[in-house]
Amino acid sequence: LRQKFVFGIGYDDDIDLAREAIVEEISAVDGVLTEPAPDTRVTELGDSAVGIQSRFWIDDPDRGDYVKVRSAAVQAVKERFDAEGIDMPYVHRQLVGEVDVNERTGN
C-alpha cells in the first residue's frame, strides 16, 4: 500500500537536506518496504512553505496497522527536522479593521 505525506519546510531551509532526512527516516521505520524505496518530490511553493511530498510503501496493508506505520514515519521525520534545525512554518495571517465595543449599562 502506497502512502503519501507532504512536509512543509521554510523557504530558507535546504531542500536537499530535508529530502535526504525524509528518505532516511522513513526508510528506517519498521514496516516500510525497501523496494520500491521511499522517495520525495518538491510539489508545492505555498504561502509560507515549500512542500515536499514523500512516497513510501508499507509491507502488509492487511494487518490494519498501516496508520501506525504512517504515524511512525511522520513522527520520525518531524523529530529529524527538529534535530537538523529545519523549520516547518505555518501560515501567518494579519487581520485588519476595527472592532467597536460599546459599554452597556443596565440594571
Predicted regions span which residues?
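Solvent-exposed, non-transmembrane regulatory segments of membrane-associated proteins
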Residues: 9-13, 35-107
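Soluble accessory domains appended to multi-pass membrane transport proteins
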Residues: 1-34
